[in-house]
């Protein structure tokens, strides 16, 4: 327990108090209110070191404010004149301004912490880590060696005071915490800001920045403690904490087992002694994959539930965590169905005059596009019916022909780009067929003609021009490999420029 406390104190010792006087400066609220200005310049161009200076920050912000005035940016807007009975006269403007300024200020030390953590590491472009596709090469490399996965829905019903207390370890400024507590208690339904239901948004969308920051900070705090406990539990040693009471006897049995069979079963025992565990978080969910047994995964399942309830006071249930065997079940993950496929093969071995067959099974990470949810998304967007039959898009008939073609082509290229990591391209061909025929029917409806007559008059090549396939994009990106691009295209391709999921690709 003492080691656990020292770990937390060491991790939280990198606190930066120099930014908090900015809360009382007028220009920080002008900077926060200007949504067209890229705030990342605060961290990209300052040249921070471990002795960060308030003077440098103030000088940079003054420069940014000068740019804002030169570009005729206005601080106040007529849309901000709504009244709020809690604050009183014309307070929607002032409350939003204060909250936006507070969000900008409180993000600075944590963004600096991220920059310091990336320094010295062999990461050429850290922005590539933002890509959603950067997760899949990791899974492709690791999951083929694993057996079970926990599909976890992270609880988000966090008590407001727990958030303030968690942030208190990092922020020494008491006034900032009082201000944060004031806003959190005014908007008690802030949890709706992190749920996917758009109808539940009751606060200005501009203020999502602070609430999403608090939620992500809370999750990162939970993950840092969880990773520390996982690292501690992976070593064969006695731990006096009551949480690991059962594990202490478990380790004693393993040590005795090692003494007896250490010569014959070293490889097997090594895997049993220190099983591989990989953790990935995405969209309020996370997955915990391991090479261990189902019994071990069930222990992790109930340990996580108790960990959330006892340490963070978040109510959770075992039903929010599902245990799946990768070889038998697919994981619905970021628009893909991911699983580990077993490829059996037979090898004939010849020894002198005798020959015999040896069976061998190779595990392969498989990613597929779930076509039924995709058709459901296209049907909801009025591109086809529930059976997947293409229909026209009447609301687009007022557009010009080029705009209609551009709209359909852009949707297909985005979907094809995002799902380029699919192991099989059949689903993409079906999506292309639906969008092409829907586009043709929309154009025919606009010109009061039939699809056959319209295509006969203009030619089917008109649609092909705007539906540039991923295979053609690949050959343009890698011209030297044009001779083999067709074979390479059939493989999975992961891109490092995808930072959001297309609405049609997100089936959840």
Swiss-Prot record:
In the record, what terms sit under GO molecular function? RNA binding
Q: List, alphabetically, the GO terms of the cellular component aspect.
A: chloroplast
| UniProt keyword list | Chloroplast, mRNA processing, Plastid, RNA-binding, tRNA processing
Localization in the cell: Plastid, Chloroplast
GO terms for biological process, alphabetical: mRNA processing; RNA splicing; tRNA processing
The highest taxon in the source lineage is Eukaryota
- Record-linked InterPro entries: Domain_X, Maturase_MatK, Maturase_MatK_N
Keyword field contains Plastid: yes
Function noted in UniProt: Usually encoded in the trnK tRNA gene intron. Probably assists in splicing its own and other chloroplast group II introns.
- Return the PANTHER family for the record: MATURASE K
Family statement: Belongs to the intron maturase 2 family. MatK subfamily.
Q: What is this protein called?
A: Maturase K
């Amino acid at each position: 327990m003492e080691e656990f406390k020292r770990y937390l104190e060491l991790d939280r010792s990198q606190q930066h108090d120099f930014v908090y006087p900015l809360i009382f400066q007028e220009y920080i609220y002008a900077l926060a209110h200007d949504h067209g200005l890229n705030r990342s310049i605060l961290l990209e161009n300052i040249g921070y070191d471990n002795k960060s200076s308030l003077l440098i920050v103030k000088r940079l912000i003054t420069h940014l404010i000068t740019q804002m005035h030169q570009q005729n940016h206005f601080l106040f807007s007529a849309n901000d004149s709504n009244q709020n009975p809690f604050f009183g006269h014309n307070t929607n403007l002032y409350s939003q301004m204060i909250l936006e300024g507070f969000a900008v200020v409180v993000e600075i030390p944590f963004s600096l912490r991220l920059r310091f953590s990336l320094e010295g590491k062999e990461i050429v472009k850290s922005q590539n880590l933002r890509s959603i596709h950067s997760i899949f090469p990791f899974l492709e490399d690791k999951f083929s060696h694993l057996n079970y996965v926990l599909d976890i829905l992270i609880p988000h019903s966090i008590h407001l005071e727990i958030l303030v207390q968690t942030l208190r370890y990092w922020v020494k400024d008491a006034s900032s915490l009082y201000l944060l507590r004031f806003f959190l208690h005014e908007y008690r339904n802030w949890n709706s800001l992190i749920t996917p239901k758009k109808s539940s948004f009751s606060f200005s969308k501009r203020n999502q920045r602070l609430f999403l920051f608090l939620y992500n900070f809370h999750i990162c705090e939970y993950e840092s403690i969880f990773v520390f406990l996982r690292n501690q539990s992976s070593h064969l040693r006695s731990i006096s904490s009551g949480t690991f009471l059962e594990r202490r006897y478990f380790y004693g049995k393993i040590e005795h087992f090692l003494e007896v069979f250490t010569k014959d079963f070293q490889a097997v025992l090594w895997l049993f002694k220190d099983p591989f565990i990989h953790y990935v978080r995405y969209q309020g969910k996370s997955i915990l994959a391991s090479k261990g047994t189902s019994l071990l995964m069930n222990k992790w399942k109930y340990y996580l539930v108790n960990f959330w309830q006892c340490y963070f006071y978040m109510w959770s249930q075992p039903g929010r965590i599902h245990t799946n065997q990768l070889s038998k079940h697919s994981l619905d993950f970021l628009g893909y169905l991911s699983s580990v496929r077993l490829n059996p093969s037979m090898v004939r071995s010849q020894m002198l005059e005798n020959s015999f067959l040896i069976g061998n099974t190779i595990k392969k990470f498989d990613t597929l596009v779930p076509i039924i949810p995709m058709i459901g998304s296209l049907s909801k967007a009025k591109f086809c019916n529930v059976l997947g039959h293409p229909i026209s898009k009447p609301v687009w008939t007022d557009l010009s022909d080029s705009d209609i073609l551009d709209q359909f082509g852009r949707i297909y290229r985005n979907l094809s780009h995002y799902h380029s990591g699919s192991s099989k391209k059949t689903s993409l061909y079906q999506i292309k067929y639906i969008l092409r025929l829907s586009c043709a029917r929309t154009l025919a409806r606009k010109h009061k003609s039939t699809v056959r007559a319209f295509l006969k008059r203009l030619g089917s090549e008109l649609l092909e021009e705007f539906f540039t396939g991923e295979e053609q994009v690949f050959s343009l990106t890698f011209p030297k490999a044009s001779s083999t691009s067709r074979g390479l295209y059939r493989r999975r391709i992961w891109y490092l420029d995808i930072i959001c999921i297309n609405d049609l690709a997100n089936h959840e």
